[in-house]
């Protein structure tokens, strides 16, 4: 389990992609790009906040008891809840995530503990309080804690999900197997559905989609996006930091230092995840910010002047060597369904405005199998909930798109759809 995305993409051999490890053009490109101002440093942006309520303690050592008070709802009195720390499941620059159990109910949760500057609002907490979706990890409640040296931490109590897509994918790689296509479809569809929700309902960009940030129930295969620590509501015309998103999944406009990017960066990252699940390893395993662009160009070919302008107008005069795109059948060294190739092509557009949206991806023919009422998991069990749409998800979507999005058998089962069909 990891209710926060931890770690970077794992290293990989490039030979499995059928790509040459070097060429004169690629070597030239690497040397020349190293002299450009492509950014590869950490930046932050935050907002002010008021003084929080704080409890003492909240250690993550096994057996440590954390007591906090929940605010009453609907006139109910405040309630004291105790959690027993079980073990740390991940650490990172943000803090740590540990598994805990509620003493009162026996429920297992994940607690994400992050260092908090009391002068600032915590954007992740604000975002988590907004979200309510079957493919986004749920926030149960939160509290602040203080250590002996007066450091203040925010503790996000999250639903427990036992696995990550990263670990599931690695379990196949270790045995030299590829993930069954039905799972690739299921995971990719659920990522797109979650992104359609946050992009369309809030203008929210996750900014760190990667296998480590995708929780999955190994029995039902329901997927939930987690770790909204980098997420932000993007406002047109307002600049954002460009050093965002883990390297292997970083859209090219970010590598070019664009600051007025869009939610299309999440779409690129989703393509990287899908390709990795199909390939068994990262598609673009760059060793640095510059090398990341080299890896992309080796597969997609050199971007045109117009494509570069769409990513960052400041680079239009830069002279790139002309490298032809690598055929997808050679990249994957196996026969992919044409629908899978088509969707990858829609994800991997240099021009952000030419990438498909998350909603468009959801209605793509690749996922028609998931809309078939007879489709089952390989073990014979039913698929996880895929079409339990809430009104907020479907708001403003034309009826003809809704009809393609929600199959007839699901509409019959859904009271909301029955009332609004």
Curated annotation (Swiss-Prot):
SMART domains: S_TKc. GO terms for molecular function: ATP binding; protein serine kinase activity; protein serine/threonine kinase activity. The modification Phosphotyrosine is found at residue 243. CDD domains: STKc_GSK3. Residues 29-42 have a biased composition (Basic and acidic residues). Expressed exclusively in inflorescences. Signal peptide: none annotated. ATP binds at residues 89-97, 112. Its EC number is 2.7.11.1. The active site is at 208 (proton acceptor). It catalyses: L-seryl-[protein] + ATP = O-phospho-L-seryl-[protein] + ADP + H(+); L-threonyl-[protein] + ATP = O-phospho-L-threonyl-[protein] + ADP + H(+). PANTHER family: GLYCOGEN SYNTHASE KINASE-3 ALPHA, SHAGGY-RELATED PROTEIN KINASE DELTA-RELATED. Belongs to the protein kinase superfamily. CMGC Ser/Thr protein kinase family. GSK-3 subfamily. This is Shaggy-related protein kinase kappa.
């Amino acid at each position: 389990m990891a209710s926060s995305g931890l770690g970077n993409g794992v290293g990989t051999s490039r030979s499995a992609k059928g790509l040459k490890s070097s060429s004169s053009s690629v070597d030239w490109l690497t040397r020349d790009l190293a002299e450009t101002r492509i950014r590869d440093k950490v930046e932050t942006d935050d907002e002010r906040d008021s003084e929080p309520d704080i409890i003492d303690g909240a250690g993550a050592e096994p057996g440590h008891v954390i007591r906090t008070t929940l605010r009453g709802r609907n006139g109910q009195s405040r309630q004291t809840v105790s959690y027993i720390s079980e073990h740390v499941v991940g650490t990172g620059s943000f803090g740590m995530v540990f598994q805990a159990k509620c003493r009162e109910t026996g429920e297992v949760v994940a607690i994400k503990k992050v260092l908090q500057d009391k002068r600032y609002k915590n954007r992740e907490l604000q975002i988590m309080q907004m979200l309510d979706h079957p493919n986004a990890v749920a926030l149960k409640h939160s509290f602040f804690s203080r250590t002996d040296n007066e450091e203040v931490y925010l503790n996000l109590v999250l639903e427990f999900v036992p696995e990550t897509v990263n670990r599931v994918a690695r379990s196949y790689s270790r045995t030299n197997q590829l993930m069954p296509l039905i799972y690739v479809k299921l995971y990719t569809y659920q990522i797109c559905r979650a992104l359609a929700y946050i992009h369309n309902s809030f203008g929210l960009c996750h900014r760190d989609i990667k296998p480590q940030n995708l929780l999955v129930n190994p029995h039902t295969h329901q997927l939930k996006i987690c770790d909204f620590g980098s997420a932000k509501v993007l406002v047109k015309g307002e600049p954002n930091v460009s050093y965002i998103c883990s390297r292997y999944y970083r859209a090219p406009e970010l590598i070019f230092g664009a600051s007025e990017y869009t939610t299309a960066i999440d779409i690129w990252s989703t393509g990287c995840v899908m390709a990795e699940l199909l390939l068994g390893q990262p598609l673009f395993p760059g060793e640095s910010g510059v090398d990341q662009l080299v890896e992309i160009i080796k597969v997609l070919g050199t971007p045109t002047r117009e494509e570069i302008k769409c990513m960052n107008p400041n680079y239009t005069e830069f002279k790139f060597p002309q490298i032809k795109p690598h055929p997808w059948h050679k990249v994957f060294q196996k026969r992919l369904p044409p629908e899978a190739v088509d969707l990858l092509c829609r994800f991997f557009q240099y021009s952000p405005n030419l990438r498909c949206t998350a909603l468009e991806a959801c209605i793509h023919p690749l996922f028609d199998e998931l809309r078939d009422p007879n489709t089952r998991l390989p073990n014979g069990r039913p698929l996880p909930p895929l079409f339990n749409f809430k009104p907020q998800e479907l708001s403003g979507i034309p009826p003809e798109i809704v009809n393609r999005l929600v199959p007839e058998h699901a509409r019959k089962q859904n009271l909301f759809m029955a009332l609004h069909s």
